Design a protein with these regions (language model features):
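Bacterial Sec-dependent signal peptides at the C-terminal "C-region" and cleavage site
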Residues: 12-21
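Compositionally biased intrinsically disordered regions enriched in Thr/Gly
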Residues: 20-181
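Sec-dependent N-terminal signal peptides
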Residues: 4-13
Length: 181
């Protein structure tokens, strides 16, 4: 019975979640091409971006309120501050004394939309499920060149000093429309 209830709660959460939960942007910081994936869970945001020339994925964290998105990394003092409107994310990138304008446009041409990702998975992807002792959330950590990597975070508290948590990654192939790892 608990499994059936959990299944329906996941479907309700998945179907009636407020607002957009995932963006895949492409564009430029200054004159450098970049790709960014933004995952929104209520007002909390985690994101990754990479300079297309180098490919190294840089994690970012932040908040989204009334269309204003603020992201920063934990190490280098890098910050993005901008507005999301009409499928665009535009604003200012800062690192130390250096400031550049950025303009990113939502584009899924060589990536998977969240809807496609949901349909590829054997089990529905729930963006977030929470109760008193359990949290599960899914975000997209890479989405480029026909591959998408979904990061599934789970936390369970069952007593004691602290809870247990884990992260699982699933890689999907757009061309063959299947889970590959």
């Amino acid at each position: 019975m608990k499994k059936i209830l959990l299944f329906f709660l996941l479907i309700l959460n998945f179907t009636f979640g407020a607002g957009k939960n995932y963006y895949h942007f492409e564009g430029k910081i200054g004159n450098l091409p970049v790709t960014m994936d933004v995952n929104v869970l209520e007002n909390y945001v985690n994101a990754t971006y990479s300079y297309d020339k180098f490919g190294e994925i840089i994690p970012l964290f932040g908040s989204l309120e009334k269309g204003k998105l603020i992201l920063s990394d934990n190490n280098e003092g890098e910050n993005f501050e901008g507005i999301i409107t009409n499928n665009k994310f535009e604003g200012t990138w800062k690192m130390g004394a250096k400031t550049l304008k950025f303009s990113l446009v939502e584009n899924y041409k060589n990536s998977l939309s969240l809807e496609e990702l949901k349909n590829l998975n054997m089990n529905p992807i729930s963006l977030s499920t929470t109760n008193d002792n359990f949290t599960r959330s899914t975000s997209v950590s890479y989405n480029k060149n026909g591959l998408a990597v979904a990061e599934e975070y789970t936390y369970v508290y069952s007593g004691g000093a602290h809870g247990n948590y884990g992260v699982n990654y699933r890689t999907y192939d757009k061309k063959f429309r299947k889970l590959i790892s």
